Amino acid sequence: MYLLIPAAGIGKRMGSNRNKLLLKVRSQPIIAWTLLAAEAANTISWIGIISQPTDWPDFRAILADLKLTKPVELIQGGSTRQESVYNGLQALPLAAEQVLIHDGARCLATPDLFNSCAQAIRHCPGLIAGVPVKDTIKVVDEQGIIQETPDRQKLWAAQTPQGFDVKLLKQCHAEGVRQGWEVTDDAALFEKCGIEVRIVEGEETNLKVTTPQDLAIAEFILTTRGV
């Protein structure tokens, strides 16, 4: 299975002006934990890191330190996540029929989750990892007045990995460019094109490290794992 990791974000909410994936959690950069999980997943055979060239020296140093056995390619990112994934799709080896896309900041995803998604995508056009929502969700207007309370039984919090048929995802990205769609994940492109996307049970610990509080939680979870 081929894995693309969007990794071009700046850690503004971390109070940092550099790529947040270079920040350390328990002595390793955030991106290193993501890469180690992908390395340990027996279904993953190739990894593409989509990032800005200014970060490549740092990423190369991390890769040299990790000594991964799987091929890793650095791919130039775009100005948005959507553009970055599009660039990543163009850089996939020709043999790639399915692809997993995983946020580099979700550094707590386990090898088992990568394997589950890699196996499931062979039987459907698209999927995302996700977990059922526990909190009651409110829809509010611009004035902060509650308009609606959706049925919690139908709500899932989207995570990554997300998996797709490569040919279909390329078509959806091309349609997104033509239509001027702006989306926050690739599943939304499939939805707009009317293509089925399934849910694979994710992991409660698979949080996206975005704030200093997330960083502290990630430290705690990694400590409990004994790594």
Curated annotation (Swiss-Prot):
Listed GO MF terms: 2-C-methyl-D-erythritol 4-phosphate cytidylyltransferase activity
Transition state stabilizer, annotated site positions: 13, 20
Record keywords: Isoprene biosynthesis, Nucleotidyltransferase, Transferase
InterPro entries given in the database record: IspD, IspD/TarI, IspD/TarI_cytidylyltransf_bact, ISPD_synthase_CS, Nucleotide-diphossugar_trans
Catalytic activity as recorded in UniProt: 2-C-methyl-D-erythritol 4-phosphate + CTP + H(+) = 4-CDP-2-C-methyl-D-erythritol + diphosphate
Pathway where it operates: Isoprenoid biosynthesis; isopentenyl diphosphate biosynthesis via DXP pathway; isopentenyl diphosphate from 1-deoxy-D-xylulose 5-phosphate: step 2/6
Any Pfam family the entry gives: IspD
Top-level taxonomic group: Bacteria
Residues the UniProt record annotates as site (Positions MEP for the nucleophilic attack): 152, 208
Biological process terms in GO annotation: isopentenyl diphosphate biosynthetic process, methylerythritol 4-phosphate pathway
Top-tier EC class: transferase
Ranges in coiled-coil conformation: none
Assigned EC number: 2.7.7.60
NCBIfam families from the UniProt entry: ispD
Protein family according to the UniProt entry: Belongs to the IspD/TarI cytidylyltransferase family. IspD subfamily.
PANTHER family linked: 2-C-METHYL-D-ERYTHRITOL 4-PHOSPHATE CYTIDYLYLTRANSFERASE, CHLOROPLASTIC
Its job: Catalyzes the formation of 4-diphosphocytidyl-2-C-methyl-D-erythritol from CTP and 2-C-methyl-D-erythritol 4-phosphate (MEP).
Protein name: 2-C-methyl-D-erythritol 4-phosphate cytidylyltransferase
